[in-house]
């Protein structure tokens, strides 16, 4: 019989930890929360200081029974749920369900699942932190009050299945506000003049800067013609050469937010997928002889702190692998305040000695890609800054200035290991300039004016929305991925080219919430609520006070909405074609991944089909069908014949109407970093890339 029972959330975690602790310990899984508010009722007694009425979650009865039996046999029970508010709440619910002494040292926390970390954590058990529990409970009750009061009104006035929440409503507002900015945007004309210049046999690029040393904007073609008329000949004098050495510091190691952003940029992962794979890496991977080991630290964190042990291991690794000159400078020590929040670390590999290249045999493709990203980011964060030599050159002709900028990596530093996703294209090539001295003469080879128009702000990607939510203080590490998932499942937004587009339904719901519950979608109000919850976690505020302050005004608004909110009828958008199964009109519907066609006779007829987008090109294979744009299971655009499966023509590149002038075969548009280039699929014919 085992002397000690340890309870964690998942079987994978249990298996790993049990091996580290030895025969005296039995580790079992609670499979997440065992108690929660009931789904069939609000479950909050408003008259009794918002007292929650918890019940055992459906299906968890057998799990609890097994845990109770094991707990009675054990000398001591340890609760080792995750090291955050949610984990503390799970431990508290388990303690209640198993009749454990809440004043006993039954709580064990760790940031990584490795032998040393687990052994060390069991040397320092503590009481359940009720401040953390209260913060989680306050969030849960707030979300229940908002959801349980507003959602039924939306069901009655708009349609079934809708929901409203504090964080999801603000996220929806950000997306819709951005769409309004885009629609209201008025493009403004501007021009640039770019030149190609010669110094001996070397060419370089420079752009028009201004006149008589002052920057001069070009707002029209008339402005450009005026400048071109003032240029005299093709000789330019090098008037000013500025050389500087610039340092570029590495990014900090990952938090939950920055991991989700970078995984979206570099790996094309959705936030939900990133967290799922990170959970696998945290809970443990079977490494063969070494057994099951957690490869990364806990993945729900907003801290960039690194333990001294991890810093020292990274320093030794960098010194040995890359050399002393690649070591980072003076490192900040770990925080001394070891409360629950400060005790969190950044997301990092549990050991830098487990290099990604050595784990290929034991990791799946996506696991490997995410681990490599985390490993490289952490190692780079402990390395020396990169050093760049920059050079700025002013060329003059009749008082007009053209400016050339160049840079060269003098010392790669951390860039030897990792460069942030948004900067990859910028840093791929050095922008070199010839050896130019003040007073030199250079010749212009080509002067090209080009018209431009200012662009509206871009729609939000998942990465950008997560970053904005974090910057505005909305939500916490555990809420970003579920929030993005919810607004898509409800049909409030759809993804178009990996960017969020609000739907008509999303606009209707937001308009109603803005009219009747303005504080719910107020960014500053929601951010203040998050800060208040943090104050509860820190033990500085009572959770009941926060909810009471919120509910007094909220209840009045609920009553007003119930009596004054008008029913909204969403008119169907007809597609102009009939259902091939029942002859009813087909209508456009918005799903999680965008628009699709559905029969208006639903639910009697459940016919649906994707919207086919023709590109106006005949199929080059069969000559009968038309080429249409389609999407793969991974949402990648490709092109195929609309006679499929009779014709199986497919192409990743977009076919065009013109034929190759050399061989008469199909031409396609290929996307390159320089722009879109027309190429022949058979011969070597290529055209100049177009931006």
Curated annotation (Swiss-Prot):
Q: Electron transport as a keyword? A: no
Cite the active-site annotation.
Answer: 298
Q: Provide GO CC annotations from the record.
A: chromosome
Which stretches make up the Topo IA-type catalytic domain? 129-558
Q: Where is this region: Interaction with DNA?
A: 163-168
Query: What terms describe the molecular function in GO for this protein?
Result: DNA binding; DNA topoisomerase type I (single strand cut, ATP-independent) activity; zinc ion binding
- Identify the EC number(s): 5.6.2.1
Q: Which UniProt keywords apply?
A: DNA-binding, Isomerase, Magnesium, Metal-binding, Repeat, Topoisomerase, Zinc, Zinc-finger
- Site described as Interaction with DNA, located at 33, 139-140, 143, 148, 155, 300, 490
Which GO BP annotation is one of this protein's?
DNA topological change
Q: Where are the zinc fingers (C4-type)?
A: 579-605, 619-647, 660-683
Domain Toprim intervals: 3-114
Q: Does the keyword Secreted apply?
A: no
* Top-level taxon of the source organism: Bacteria
Query: What Gene3D superfamilies would the database entry show?
Result: 3.40.50.140, Bacterial Topoisomerase I, domain 1, Topoisomerase I, domain 2, Topoisomerase I, domain 3, Topoisomerase I, domain 4
Quaternary structure and interacting proteins, as annotated: Monomer. Interacts with the RNA polymerase core.
Q: Which family does it belong to?
A: Belongs to the type IA topoisomerase family.
What NCBIfam families does the annotation carry?
A: topA_bact (TIGR01051)
The name this protein carries in UniProt is DNA topoisomerase 1
Naturally occurring in which organism (per UniProt): Bacillus subtilis (strain 168)
């Amino acid at each position: 019989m085992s002397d000690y029972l340890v309870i964690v959330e998942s079987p994978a975690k249990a298996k790993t930890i049990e091996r580290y602790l030895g025969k005296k310990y039995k580790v079992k899984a609670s499979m997440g929360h065992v108690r929660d508010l009931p789904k069939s009722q609000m479950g909050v007694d408003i008259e009794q200081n918002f007292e929650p009425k918890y019940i055992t979650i459906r299906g968890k009865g057998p799990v609890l029974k097994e845990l109770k039996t094991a707990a009675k046999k054990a000398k001591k029970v340890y609760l080792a749920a995750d090291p955050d508010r949610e984990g503390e709440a799970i431990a508290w619910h388990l303690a209640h369900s198993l009749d454990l002494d809440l004043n006993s040292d039954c709580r064990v926390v760790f940031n990584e699942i490795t032998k040393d970390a687990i052994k060390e954590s069991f040397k320092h058990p503590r009481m359940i932190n009720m401040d953390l529990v209260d913060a989680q409970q306050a969030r849960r009750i707030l979300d229940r009050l908002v959801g349980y009061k507003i959602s039924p009104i939306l069901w009655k006035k708009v349609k079934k299945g809708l929901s409203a929440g504090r964080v999801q409503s603000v996220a929806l507002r950000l997306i819709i506000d951005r769409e309004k900015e885009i629609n209201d945007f008025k493009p403004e004309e501007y021009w640039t003049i770019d030149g190609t210049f010669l110094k001996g046999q070397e060419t370089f690029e420079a752009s028009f800067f201004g006149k008589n040393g002052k920057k001069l904007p070009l707002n029209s073609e008339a402005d450009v013609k005026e400048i071109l008329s003032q240029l005299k000949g093709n000789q330019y004098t090098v008037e000013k050469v500025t050389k500087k050495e610039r340092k570029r510091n590495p990014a900090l190691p990952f938090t939950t937010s920055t991991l989700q952003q970078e995984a979206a940029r570099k790996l094309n992962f959705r936030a939900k997928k990133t967290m799922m794979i990170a959970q696998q890496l945290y809970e443990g991977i079977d490494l063969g002889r070494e057994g099951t080991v957690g490869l990364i630290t806990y993945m729900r964190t907003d801290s960039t702190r690194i333990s001294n042990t991890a810093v020292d291991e990274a320093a030794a690794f960098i010194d040995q692998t890359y050399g002393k000159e690649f070591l980072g400078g003076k490192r900040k020590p770990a925080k001394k305040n070891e409360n629950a929040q400060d005790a969190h670390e950044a997301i990092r590999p549990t050991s830098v000695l487990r290099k990604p290249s050595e784990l290929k045999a034991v990791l799946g493709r996506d696991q490997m890609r995410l681990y490599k990203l985390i490993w490289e980011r952490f190692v780079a964060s402990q390395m020396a800054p990169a050093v760049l030599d920059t050079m700025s050159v002013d060329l003059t002709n009749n008082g007009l200035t053209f400016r050339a900028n160049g840079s060269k990596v003098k010392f790669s530093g951390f860039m030897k290991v990792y460069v942030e996703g948004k900067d990859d294209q910028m840093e791929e090539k050095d922008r070199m300039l010839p050896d130019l001295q003040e007073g030199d003469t250079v010749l212009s080879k080509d002067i090209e004016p080009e018209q431009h128009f200012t662009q509206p702000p871009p729609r939000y990607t998942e990465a950008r929305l997560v970053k904005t939510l974090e910057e505005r203080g909305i939500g916490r590490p555990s809420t970003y991925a579920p929030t993005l998932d919810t607004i898509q499942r409800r049909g409030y937004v759809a993804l178009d080219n990996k960017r969020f587009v609000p739907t008509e339904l999303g606009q209707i719901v937001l308009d109603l919430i803005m009219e009747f519950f303005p504080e719910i979608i107020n960014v500053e109000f929601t951010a203040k609520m998050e800060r208040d919850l943090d104050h509860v976690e820190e033990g500085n505020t009572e959770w009941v006070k926060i909810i009471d302050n919120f509910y007094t005004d909220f209840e009045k608004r609920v009553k007003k909405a119930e009596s004054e909110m008008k029913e909204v009828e969403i008119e169907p958008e007809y597609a102009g074609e009939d259902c091939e199964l029942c002859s009813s009109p087909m209508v456009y519907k918005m799903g999680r991944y965008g628009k699709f066609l559905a029969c208006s006779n639903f639910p009697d007829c459940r016919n649906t089909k994707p919207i086919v987008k023709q590109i106006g090109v005949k199929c080059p294979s069969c000559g009968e069908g038309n080429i249409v744009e389609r999407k793969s299971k991974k949402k990648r655009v490709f092109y195929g014949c609309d006679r499929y499966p009779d014709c199986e023509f497919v192409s990743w590149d977009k076919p065009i109407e013109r034929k190759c002038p050399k061989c008469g075969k199909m031409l396609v548009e290929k996307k390159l970093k320089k722009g879109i280039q027309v190429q022949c699929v058979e011969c070597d014919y290529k055209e100049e890339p177009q931006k």
